[in-house]
């Protein structure tokens, strides 16, 4: 296994819609393992393939550090098939380091996809797991959590981010 580089905003791959995974082979299993190791090392609770430079519909999520009930979830070609309610949660992102903001999402979701073994699976989630799944699936659509901020907060973020990038290159 290997630690992969995490792409950060404004890397263009973060704005691309991920390609559907057509088959599960050794290369995909290695990517899953590498993404999982990268997520743990970061540390994070979720990671989408495009965050590590691969335009594939693949996510890994593990809330075990936050919630003993859930372990590692690997989802290939995940889709949200049902939603209910609304929740606001303080979110951050490995691709937008050191920035956190409250984001409105669905309180409950049902997600379908395939596991690393190729078997179809369905996950019913609420709370942090629902938020994490929606956040990672957004990545696969080329969306970042900052896109869900209200216009004023998003504008403040963009100004702060430009200043941060300018300082980093000075």
From Swiss-Prot:
Its cofactor is: Fe(2+)
Q: What class of enzyme is it?
A: hydrolase
Q: Can you tell me which residues bind Fe cation?
A: 93, 135, 139
Q: Which residues form the active site?
A: 136
> Coiled-coil regions in this chain?
none
Q: Which keywords fit this entry according to its UniProt record? A: Hydrolase, Iron, Metal-binding, Protein biosynthesis
A Gene Ontology annotation in the biological process aspect, one of them, is: translation
Q: Which HAMAP family match?
A: Pep_deformylase
Q: Which PANTHER family match?
A: PEPTIDE DEFORMYLASE
Instruction: Give the function comment from the record.
Output: Removes the formyl group from the N-terminal Met of newly synthesized proteins. Requires at least a dipeptide for an efficient rate of reaction. N-terminal L-methionine is a prerequisite for activity but the enzyme has broad specificity at other positions.
Name by which UniProt lists this protein: Peptide deformylase
Which gene does this sequence derive from? def
